[in-house]
A protein has these predicted regions:
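Solvent-exposed loop/turn segments at secondary-structure junctions
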Residues: 21-24, 71-76, 142-143, 171-174
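The substrate-binding groove and active-site-proximal loops of carbohydrate-active enzymes
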Residues: 1, 34-48, 102-117, 134-143
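N-terminal structural segment of carbohydrate-active enzymes
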Residues: 1-64, 72
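An active-site-proximal structural segment forming one wall of the substrate-binding cleft
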Residues: 4-10, 51-65, 69-70, 79-88, ...
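Active-site cleft segment of glycoside hydrolase catalytic domains centered on the general acid/base Glu
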Residues: 86-118, 140-157
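Hydrophobic faces of well-ordered beta-strands that scaffold small-molecule active sites
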Residues: 15-17, 65-67, 136, 166-168
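Aromatic- and acidic-residue-enriched segments that line the glycan-binding/catalytic groove
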Residues: 26-37, 71-99, 180-184
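Active-site-proximal helices and loops of the catalytic beta/alpha 8
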Residues: 55, 59, 122-123, 129, ...
Length: 184
């Protein structure tokens, strides 16, 4: 928070924080995109109160804050692993990594599972409700079904209204129809 004035002086209107969630260690390659717990901070980034203070001070200075969101996969030691059907499985029933991506450090989520979808949406709501962030930059948005994004964005707007800012990493222009403000 000590450098927010300097950041603001650069013309910054939005702070985008890369994944700051607790990282997994099983099969890990030190990637912040290997999320162990969507509702816990990586201890190296401070406390929940630290993040709340950062967001509040950024808002006071007229800046919005978005978090990077990793909705396609989790770490192999995420507590969700207790629910095997929340993950994509091969023909033998083994949980798999996202196909064709070379990401062996993460497990692919199964968006056909309504309970997993509900848990994902609950985790997204958490940061908006508890920390008052302004939205998300969604990693590999094309790897998540369009109907999930439509539902999630609509529900998040019930909390944030039109102030919600949603960015999609991808190139499919259909992501705009899902409610994303920017696709890149």
């Amino acid at each position: 928070t000590t450098r927010l004035d300097e950041i603001k002086s650069l013309g910054t209107t939005v702070l985008w924080l890369m994944p700051i969630y607790e990282q997994g260690v099983e099969n890990a390659v030190s990637s912040p995109y290997c999320v162990k717990d969507y509702k816990k901070l990586n201890a190296g980034y401070g406390t929940l109160d630290d993040v709340k203070t950062l967001v509040a001070r950024a808002h006071e200075k007229g800046m919005r804050v978005i978090f990077d969101w990793v909705a396609n996969h989790t770490s192999w030691d995420n507590a969700w692993m207790q629910n095997k059907t929340w993950y994509t499985q091969d023909a033998n029933g083994n949980i798999i990594s996202p196909e064709g991506m070379g990401w062996a450090d993460v497990a692919d989520l199964n968006y056909d599972n309504v309970d997993m979808r509900a848990a994902m949406l609950e985790a997204m709501k958490y940061w908006i409700e508890v920390v008052d962030i302004d939205g998300y930059r969604c990693d590999y948005a094309e790897g998540v079904p369009h109907d999930f994004w439509q539902q999630a964005i609509n529900e998040l707007k019930t909390i944030k209204g039109d102030e919600l800012l949603m960015l999609a990493e991808g190139s499919e222009t259909t992501l705009f129809a899902d409610g994303f403000d920017l696709v890149y």
